[in-house]
Every structure is written in C-alpha cells, then in structure tokens.
Amino acid sequence: MQLLKQNYKKYILDLNDAQFNRAVKPIIEQDYRINQIIEWIYAKKAVSFESFTNIPKELRNKLDEKFFLRTLKIVKKEKSLIDSTIRYTFRTADKKYFFAVFLPANGKNSVCISSQIGCPIMCAFCSSGKTKLARNLSRGEIIEQILQVENDTKEKISGILFMGMGEPMLNFNNLISVLNSLLSSKEFGIGKRHITVSSVGIVPAVKKLADDNFGVRLALSLHAVDERQRKKLVPDNLGFSIEDILKAGKYYLKKTNSHLTIEYVLVKGINISSADAHKLARLLKRCDLINSDVQVNLIPFNPVTDVQFQRPDKKSINKFKSILKLNGITVNVRQSKGANINAACGQLGY
C-alpha cells in the first residue's frame, strides 16, 4: 500500500514555476509560504521537507505526502589529487547512471552537468558517444545535479556548463525549463554570462534558443573543417552542414548579443594539419565569425578506453593555434581538468 501511495507522488524539481504554484496552492493557507518553500529548495538546498523549520509541521507533512524532494543518489565520487576536480556518478530512480563534474576555480566554481543518459550523437573521440542513449534527463534530474554537488562540496556554484553526457538541444523543452530556473532570482539566480550550452549544432534548436533570447553563452562543437572529416568524428550529425552550423552560430550572436565558442577537439593525424587550420580560418571569415564575441577553443584529445585516437604533441597544437591567431581569431587551448579521473572533455562514460 505504501509503495502504491509513493507512486502518486510528484518529483517537485520536475515542476516549472507555473506547475509548482498549481500543485502547491491547494495545500497552503498563505501565499507567502510558496516563496518560503522555494527558498528551502533552491537557496538552502534542503534534502527533506522535515528541515523546512519555518513552515508548520502540518504543511511539511502534506508536502511529504505529495512530493519527492530528491530522486538521485551519488553512487561514486572521484576527486583528482592534481586539480581537485570531482567526478560524480549518479543513479536515477529507475537505476540508470550518468555523470556530473565539479570544477573548482578560486571561488568561481562551475559544474558540468548532463542532459541525457547516454548520447545519440556518437562522437568517435568521446566516451559518452559509446553509450547508447537510454533517455532524456528530466528537468528535475538536471537541476538536482547542481543541488547535490553544492550539498556535497559545501561550495557555491557560480557557473553552469551543459557539457556533460548528452546533447542538450535534443532535450530542448527541459533545457529551456532549466534555464528559466537558473536565471530566476527566486531560484538559482545565476547570471546568463555564467551559463554555457554546448551543442554539436542542431540548427533549428540553436535558432530557437536564439529567438527565446536567454542570452546564455553558446558553444558549438565543430571538430572538423570538411564534411567527410566531420562525419568520421561526429557520425550522427543529423545532416546539418558545417556552414549551416556556423551560420546558426552567427544568427545566435545577432539575436542575443552573447558570446560564441567554437569547440575543436585536436586529434593527431586527423584534423590538425596546417591546411585544416587555414580552412577553419576561411570558414569563420566566410560566416563573419571573426570578432571579439567569438573564440575558438582548441581541446587536445583526452585518452578514452578502446578509442585508438592519439593526442597531438605541443608543437602541432601551437602551430595550429598560431595560424588561427595570425588570421585574427581569438583562440584558446583548453587546459583539461580531471583527466586523471576520466572527468575531462570526452571522458564521461562507463
């Protein structure tokens, strides 16, 4: 009987603002209680309704009867002794597993969160791509990653990176709902310039995100300069051409006045020749993407089990970078954190 009763409970973090108000109003007597409940969930990061100490016990009991507050469990935690990065393995209520990464940085801490369990894009250099897509993460499961990491580390999170497992643009409705919560002063209150959504370039979704005008940062995972090369690295690119993806990035910039990053994983012998660098520069110029709001982020390949690619040497990386710089492109080589615990770019897999 108790199990049957539990099945009627709602996961409170799955509810957007309007849904939350509709669900809670029938059991409260004073409207101000809504803001108190929101404060306990998001600001105080309470893990049980019993801890809502400024709310009457009768209301706490009603909340506990109607809602789940948390559904995820941290089943594994690995901390790098090199840079203090932490890799979390979460288990869902339906016994599926995914990952998040805490990235400390002198008080400006970020968390890299997942949007799906597994990934349908199957990037050849990425461990997540070897994991068959199980399902989208719900709004609540995406949000709970942040709350659990803050609870565990006792550190304030000021930056959010949608760069974990999955393609955020293929979980678009939940992405939008989560962005609303992240930007809401009543909930997380994180500035739009401190949120980055990474995508392989789902062109209609990029344009829709631009039209919604959240103004968050966008990172486009390009990784190649011609279609044949990209098909090898990003097998399921859903048919969008490199130029269409870059044009969608330009559209995003014009609509949001935000910042665009072009992500480019450097793989030895595949996409790191001088010709590749010159071609990338020409592509960016043709799409009018050489300006102060655009940065190319070069990511040297991080080792992944059963993937035969190799990391290029520093000389090759620096040569590629210098060609881009000579063409007026703002370029950075990412210093991957957590590589020794399989928490860096491309390493989030089972």
From Swiss-Prot:
GO terms for cellular component: cytoplasm. Belongs to the radical SAM superfamily. RlmN family. S-adenosyl-L-methionine binds at G166, E167, S198, S221, L222, H223, N302. It is an enzyme of class 2 (transferase). It comes from the Bacteria. Transmembrane segments: none annotated. Specifically methylates position 2 of adenine 2503 in 23S rRNA and position 2 of adenine 37 in tRNAs. Residues 105-342 form the Radical SAM core domain. InterPro entries: Aldolase_TIM, Methyltransferase_A, RlmN_N, RNA_MTrfase_RlmN, rRNA_lsu_MTrfase_RlmN/Cfr, rSAM. It is found in: Cytoplasm. [4Fe-4S] cluster binds at C119, C123, C126. Binds 1 [4Fe-4S] cluster. The cluster is coordinated with 3 cysteines and an exchangeable S-adenosyl-L-methionine. GO terms for molecular function: 4 iron, 4 sulfur cluster binding; metal ion binding; rRNA (adenine(2503)-C2-)-methyltransferase activity; rRNA binding; tRNA (adenine(37)-C2)-methyltransferase activity; tRNA binding. Its cofactor is [4Fe-4S] cluster. Disulfide bonds join C112-C345. The keyword 4Fe-4S applies. Keywords: 4Fe-4S, Cytoplasm, Disulfide bond, Iron, Iron-sulfur, Metal-binding, Methyltransferase, rRNA processing, S-adenosyl-L-methionine, Transferase, tRNA processing. The active site is at C345. This is Probable dual-specificity RNA methyltransferase RlmN. Pfam families: Radical_SAM, RlmN_N. Its EC number is 2.1.1.192. It catalyses: adenosine(2503) in 23S rRNA + 2 reduced [2Fe-2S]-[ferredoxin] + 2 S-adenosyl-L-methionine = 2-methyladenosine(2503) in 23S rRNA + 5'-deoxyadenosine + L-methionine + 2 oxidized [2Fe-2S]-[ferredoxin] + S-adenosyl-L-homocysteine; adenosine(37) in tRNA + 2 reduced [2Fe-2S]-[ferredoxin] + 2 S-adenosyl-L-methionine = 2-methyladenosine(37) in tRNA + 5'-deoxyadenosine + L-methionine + 2 oxidized [2Fe-2S]-[ferredoxin] + S-adenosyl-L-homocysteine. Reaction proceeds by a ping-pong mechanism involving intermediate methylation of a conserved cysteine residue.
